[in-house]
Amino acid sequence: MTPLYLASGSPRRRELLTQIGVPFIVISAPVDESPLPSESAPAYVERLARAKAAAGLVSVDGPAVVLGADTAVVLDGRILGKPENREDALAMLADLSGREHQVLTAVALDDGQRVHSFCVTSTVRFRAISTDEAQRYWASGEPSDKAGGYAIQGLGAVFVSGLSGSYSAVVGLPLCETADLLGQFGIACWQSLAHTPEVTNPQ
């Protein structure tokens, strides 16, 4: 089986691939993430996913399949990146407070012969966030390296009052669609089952 390389430094994506039992090797694939003029959010994330996969492919020897992915938080058509500082993070949380926004995650697979990619859009609804809550959340350190200034799988989960779409896509990798695409490249899931804590019935 052709080895799979993950062109991402995201620990969330590593955890998600491990969750579905797919063995992989992490590689670095830095790319210019600047949006192009008038580029739509779906086109932006899919272009970056493909660019990361292509950049990863040139750094490995022999047959390989490289997975690249990119996630963007979008509010009113505006892409919210990682906050630059405390003020930026608090402004993002204020904008997201009490509203719905979209999270777009694109995934690309590249084996040097073909490149396939897709984009999944999910809608996340936030409850109202007080100024004090936003300040305490920033102090936790979690928002500083997260697109949109929050992590749905972390402390930021308390802000989420609803979600339509793929939870795993919001975290960083839509597992259902990714598993299907991996299968098209001959890479099966459930090769190495992740450890699942035993659940004991308290009754």
UniProtKB/Swiss-Prot annotation:
The active site is at D70. GO terms for biological process: nucleotide metabolic process. Keywords: Cytoplasm, Hydrolase, Nucleotide metabolism. One of its GO terms (molecular function) is dTTP diphosphatase activity. Belongs to the Maf family. YhdE subfamily. The record marks R12, T71, Q153 as: Important for substrate specificity. Its EC number is 3.6.1.9. SUPFAM superfamilies: ITPase-like (SSF52972). HAMAP family: Maf. It is found in: Cytoplasm. One of its GO terms (cellular component) is cytoplasm. Pfam families: Maf. Nucleoside triphosphate pyrophosphatase that hydrolyzes dTTP and UTP. May have a dual role in cell division arrest and in preventing the incorporation of modified nucleotides into cellular nucleic acids. This is dTTP/UTP pyrophosphatase. Its cofactor is a divalent metal cation. It catalyses: dTTP + H2O = dTMP + diphosphate + H(+); UTP + H2O = UMP + diphosphate + H(+). CDD domains: Maf.
